[in-house]
From Swiss-Prot:
Residue stretches in coiled coil: none
Gene3D superfamilies: Protein of unknown function DUF1054 (3.30.930.20)
Record-stated family: Belongs to the UPF0637 family.
Protein name listed in UniProt: UPF0637 protein SAR1080
Length: 204
């Protein structure tokens, strides 16, 4: 019995038709692990940064018609929410599990906060080959950093700084069949390794 990780069948919750039925599937197959990950990694971030982190599991409460295409747990230093702050995320679409750190378009002082990525431009480029960027958290697209030109990356960061709807996350994503999802031990090791790469961008 696993506590933290996800099986390929759990991702199929996003194939269930209808809002109520899909939410039921998400609640049964995905949300319990998100809560466990929330407990584990809020402690992890608190110990790594010296700041108190709180987990925020997506509720999808505002939805009245369209079922969610993804779900997540986010980590930030506010009990009230995470969207206004730089934050870490563990989440999933039907075809991927993703891990991210960055800034949403709703962030307070977004232009100032996004400049960390401008200052750490070289560090972004030096991330391992399987690291990606996400420029819209609502879409599954996450191009590999290694496939972006300098200009592509600079433009993406500038958009987060200057455009109201701009966002920027560094990310990592794996498929539902990935061997790192086969056990809690392998999954937690993958997540900790990823967050260790993200943390210098948080504390910069």
């Amino acid at each position: 019995m696993t506590k933290y990780t996800f099986k390929p069948k759990d991702f199929k919750a996003f194939n269930v038709e209808g809002l109520d039925a899909r939410m039921e599937a998400v609640n049964e197959y995905i949300r319990p692990q998100l809560h466990e990950l929330g407990e584990y990694f809020s402690d992890f971030f608190t110990s790594q940064t010296g700041e108190t982190f709180y987990p925020h599991v997506a509720k999808h409460a505002r939805r009245s018609v369209n079922p969610p295409k993804d779900t997540w747990v986010a980590f930030a230093t506010s009990k009230r929410g995470y969207k206004m702050l730089p934050h870490f995320q563990i989440g999933m679409f039907e075809d991927q599990l993703f891990v991210m750190f960055g800034i949403m378009h709703e962030a307070k002082d977004k232009a100032t906060r996004a400049k960390v990525f401008e200052r750490k431009f070289k560090a972004i480029q030096q991330l391992p080959d399987d690291y990606r960027v996400c420029l819209d958290h609502m879409k599954p697209d996450k191009p590999f950093i290694k496939d972006l030109t300098d200009d592509d990356l600079k433009e993406a960061i500038q958009r987060a700084i200057n455009v109201k709807k701009g966002e920027f996350f560094i990310a990592r994503a794996i498929t539902p069949q990935d061997k790192r999802l086969k056990s809690d031990k392998a999954f937690i090791a993958f997540l900790e390794e990823t967050f260790d790469q993200f943390l210098p961008f948080y504390s910069a």
